């Protein structure tokens, strides 16, 4: 809890005085001008004017110097100040003071709350206070006009409310030019949300419209308390080396919302805590949460029955999603904050880091037809990338583009990231469409917008920058330099930066090229053996020359975008008609293969092949250098029925099916054993790219790799500090093969993984009752340094001393 600053405590009552303003004489204060300074609340609200009579002696108390008294008549003059009415909602009388311009947001101090908000273009502003009941009724409880002389410093509007504001909410009105063609959307009829609000209150129940069926009811920010009651129980960052991570991409609501989860609060932070032990058993040590910032799941509901389930449409970046909380809007959103903190704390107790998926590329305000919620009504031309006639650049594909490299916006983003690290204890961030953060900003300056010469070149709005100020600022921040930073290194405007994202040797990337090459090779496409080998080595062709390491590559085969792992081997084309866009949405370039028949209902041989292929993909993921990431449900074969863009469905298609997990326990067992095997093998999570001294390539014969256009076989052996040596091979051909193994005198190769075998023999654990018999079946091959592989299969062998 901070103390009340001297500039506030020294000026206890009279709003006419300008705390912190240097050296004005008494004239402007006492000769009538004071009567228009913050003298009353807006019409229609319950404010009242309080007349005060004071002498020049009292003027000295509020900052008039003794030398300024000279020549002032000793006469009393009525000066107006503001005292907020004694209403139950405000817990007694409150007084209005000028406040401070920093920090931005609402800050609880001794004796009251300081409010500060940036708006360069507004001509007038007022602070709106709500009780929860008044917010639900869409009524402002109290409104405090802000005087541009006393309540504005530079482009920051500020005010200090002295008194008790417990269980109150707030927002702002801004007046100014409403001229979309000039990039301005000021509208005094709107109460907008402070971008720095730490919780945003609107609807309490997920998926339920507000009063009168309103999908966009009035929103307001939580006014913070001067103290925190949350007990972190000594929680500290885990700080795992990134090379040791196994990342699980999950949707927090979808993880436990299905009835088969059997948790007390399904679809919430608390519900997810109940299943953290499952993730630990799965071998996961990091979860990447799909968006948990405040968004409106009913964003599309007024024009269709679709839900914004995924949440990639942020309203407020500081606030955790209120309706993911079992408490909802209770306690003005503080319960939601504490539940998110509890999730992080309990994840850390189980050795699981928490990475947040953040969407700093656009907001829920959309294009010029979108709602005015926050940024647009505060300063549209600052927060959004605009064209010369006010049009919104749309590099996000969602109607607007956040103006990330604007000085004010990049400071906002860094402040937000710092908050989630220091206050919420998250371990890192995955930046959605991160290439937008490398584009040049618009400053709403005709020279800048149309292009200004920079060292002979033209830098226009949206131009990719070699050293983007925002990325530079994040990379060199003393707080953020120690957290995981992952870029989705492309955007919807055609900028693709995989392997080339500005990185400062800190940033990792979702390796989309890994995904595409591995999909091509595993399904048996010619010409990808060499590329697949590069992927197994951590993609040195992408990262080594730039000074990065294998662990800067986040390897994945499937993610929330696109097919699930099961659908990748079941469908050759997408089936997105249920999205209501005539199957036009979603990716067409899926690189999938249905294994011979389209859809779930296929013959037995096709289903067996699909099981092999899912295991092959998972093996490739776990034996590749770099950081493996897999999507929630892929470990049991979750299907979305061929829909590769399920952003709008709040039902079973996006829910983790705990009942199906039990039915598909064989695949779940295999995936869990593979993640643990990776952790046991020092050689599979190297700090640097493997060298020829450690890793050896093989073909059907040892030491003779085949990198030809028609090759569909890749194998390698690698020395390992814990396992001694392992041999890994992939046969992506439609034909079986007998593979020659490297000779190791005094040792023998012993099978561990064979995706061509039925469960549980696909992974031979030491506790398998008939393991010895299963190994013996291959002895006549292994004694000759041979191993038979089925078509479309992969194997892992371990080197053991000869008996």
UniProtKB/Swiss-Prot annotation:
Q: In which tissues is it expressed?
A: Highly expressed in developing endosperm. Expressed at low levels in leaves.
Q: Which domain of life is it from?
A: Eukaryota
Knocked-out gene: effects: Replacement of endosperm starch by a water-soluble highly and randomly branched polysaccharide structure called phytoglycogen.
Any GO CC annotation of this UniProt entry: chloroplast isoamylase complex
Once renumbered to this chain, the transit peptide range reads 1-54
Q: How is its activity regulated?
A: Inhibited by copper chloride, mercury chloride, ammonium molybdate and para-chloromercuribenzoate.
Q: In which pathway does it act?
A: Glycan biosynthesis; starch biosynthesis
Which GO biological process entries does UniProt record here? amylopectin biosynthetic process; starch biosynthetic process; starch catabolic process
Question: What InterPro entries does its record include?
Answer: GlgX_Isoamylase_N_E_set (IPR044505), Glyco_hydro_13_cat_dom (IPR006047), Glyco_hydro_13_N (IPR004193), Glyco_hydro_b (IPR013780), Glycoside_hydrolase_SF (IPR017853), Ig-like_fold (IPR013783), Ig_E-set (IPR014756), ISOA1-3-like_C (IPR048650)
Q: Which UniProt keywords apply?
A: Carbohydrate metabolism, Chloroplast, Glycosidase, Hydrolase, Plastid, Starch biosynthesis, Transit peptide
The places in or outside the cell where this protein is found are: Plastid, Chloroplast
Instruction: Name the catalytic site residues.
Output: 432, 488
Give the enzyme's EC designation.
3.2.1.68
Site: Transition state stabilizer. Where? 561
- From the UniProt record, list the reaction(s) this protein catalyses: Hydrolysis of (1->6)-alpha-D-glucosidic branch linkages in glycogen, amylopectin and their beta-limit dextrins
State one molecular function term (GO). isoamylase activity
Its EC top class is hydrolase
One family name in Pfam for this protein: Alpha-amylase
Outline the subunit composition: Forms a homo-pentamer and a hetero-hexamer composed of five ISA1 and one ISA2. Interacts with FLO6/SIP4.
Instruction: Please give the function described in this protein's UniProt entry.
Output: Starch-debranching enzyme involved in amylopectin biosynthesis in endosperm. Functions by removing excess branches or improper branches that interfere with the formation of double helices of the cluster chains of amylopectin and crystallization of starch. Works as ISA1 homooligomer or together with ISA2 as heterooligomer. The heterooligomer ISA1 and ISA2 possesses higher affinity than the ISA1 homooligomer for various branched polyglucans in vitro, but no marked differences exist in chain preferences for debranching of amylopectin and phytoglycogen between these forms.
| Family of this protein | Belongs to the glycosyl hydrolase 13 family.
Instruction: List the protein's name.
Output: Isoamylase 1, chloroplastic
What taxonomic lineage is listed for the species of origin?
A: Eukaryota, Viridiplantae, Streptophyta, Embryophyta, Tracheophyta
The primary gene name is ISA1
